[in-house]
């Protein structure tokens, strides 16, 4: 399988997001990289499902709460940015204060 660098990045985000999703499902609190991966993967999947940038910006704030992450992690993540592919091209999706 031949993947370009962008496709490799998306594959890495998806894999890390899947690990984070499984850990969250087991009741574990997510650390910083897991929380960012969880949100990023969900945003990429949302774009694939046809959500708009505005919808994704709101959706990103609903995925995790402070009770889902280790102490201090919510304060460490001021924003999450991911370049998602939409029918009309790639766009940068930014979610400010994703963990409330």
UniProtKB/Swiss-Prot annotation:
Keywords: Cytoplasm, Hydrolase. It is an enzyme of class 3 (hydrolase). It catalyses: urea + 2 H2O + H(+) = hydrogencarbonate + 2 NH4(+). Its main location: cytoplasm. The keyword Hydrolase applies. One of its GO terms (biological process) is urea catabolic process. It is found in: Cytoplasm. Its EC number is 3.5.1.5. Pathway: Nitrogen metabolism; urea degradation; CO(2) and NH(3) from urea (urease route): step 1/1. Pfam families: Urease_gamma (PF00547). InterPro entries: Urease_gamma, Urease_gamma/gamma-beta_su, Urease_gamma_sf, Urease_subunit. It comes from the Bacteria. One of its GO terms (cellular component) is cytoplasm. GO terms for molecular function: nickel cation binding; urease activity. Belongs to the urease gamma subunit family. Heterotrimer of UreA (gamma), UreB (beta) and UreC (alpha) subunits. Three heterotrimers associate to form the active enzyme. PANTHER family: UREASE (PTHR33569:SF1). NCBIfam families: PRK13241.1 (NF009712), urease_gam (TIGR00193). This is Urease subunit gamma. It comes from Acinetobacter baylyi (strain ATCC 33305 / BD413 / ADP1). The gene is ureA.
